[in-house]
């Protein structure tokens, strides 16, 4: 909660630098995400690209994501929430709860900041910070989405994946304009665009208003869901 109301520049000014980190954030050459900045310069952990959660002891994954302010003054999420790459080059786990995507999504420390294109990226203000876990109702849909994605991959048809096939958990393209391709583990071993598991933007908009901003009577467009109890 200490982060709420701070700008990224104020985070940098705290002077926290983990041992062995030489990244220079406060310049135009830094192309990384703001989540890495928070992990290293607020929590003091050296960022890594491992499949485990960012804070392994607590099993918590850190994600920083932008918010857009609409004309009516309400917020909407600025983008989907990318979780982890989909491994096309090896077998996909049939059990959702044993998968890397569950390790990355079981507990997420969400840091939402207001995106203002008139301000420098380091002067964006952090609005909300909260740990979220998918509710039991959400997990029913997420697990079914995972099953659909895994079934297509195991059929050797990863090139047919599309975010439109699922409800909450998506398979978004990665790489330069989705052009990077990888050979599939499953026959006929054709190449497919690299993709990552993500929580779709519509689902994250629901999470923002129902779990973080605690608003009521809001639903994901075109989806029928039951409101979950507070967890």
Describe these PLM feature segments:
Residues 1-55, 61-231:
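Nucleic-acid endonuclease domains
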């Amino acid at each position: 909660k200490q982060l709420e109301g701070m700008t990224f520049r104020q985070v940098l000014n705290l002077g926290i630098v983990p041992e062995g980190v030489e990244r220079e954030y406060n310049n135009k050459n830094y192309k990384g995400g703001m989540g890495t900045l928070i992990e290293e310069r607020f929590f003091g952990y050296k960022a890594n690209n491992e499949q485990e959660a960012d804070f392994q002891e607590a099993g918590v994954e850190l994600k920083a994501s932008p918010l857009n302010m609409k004309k009516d003054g309400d917020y909407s999420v600025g983008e989907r929430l990318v979780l982890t790459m989909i491994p096309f080059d090896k077998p996909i786990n049939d059990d959702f709860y044993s998968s890397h995507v569950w390790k990355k999504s079981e507990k997420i420390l969400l840091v939402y900041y207001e995106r203002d294109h008139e301000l420098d990226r380091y002067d964006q203000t952090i609005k909300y910070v909260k740990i979220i876990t998918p509710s039991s109702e959400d997990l029913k849909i997420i697990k079914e989405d995972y099953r659909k994605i895994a079934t297509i991959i195991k059929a050797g048809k990863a090139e047919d994946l599309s975010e439109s096939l699922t409800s909450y958990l998506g398979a978004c393209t990665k790489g330069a304009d989705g052009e990077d391709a990888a050979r599939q583990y499953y026959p006929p071993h054709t190449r497919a665009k690299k993709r990552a598991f993500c929580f779709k933007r519509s689902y994250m908009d629901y999470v923002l208003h129902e779990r973080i901003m605690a608003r009521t009577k809001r639903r994901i467009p075109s989806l029928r869901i039951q409101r979950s109890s507070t967890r």
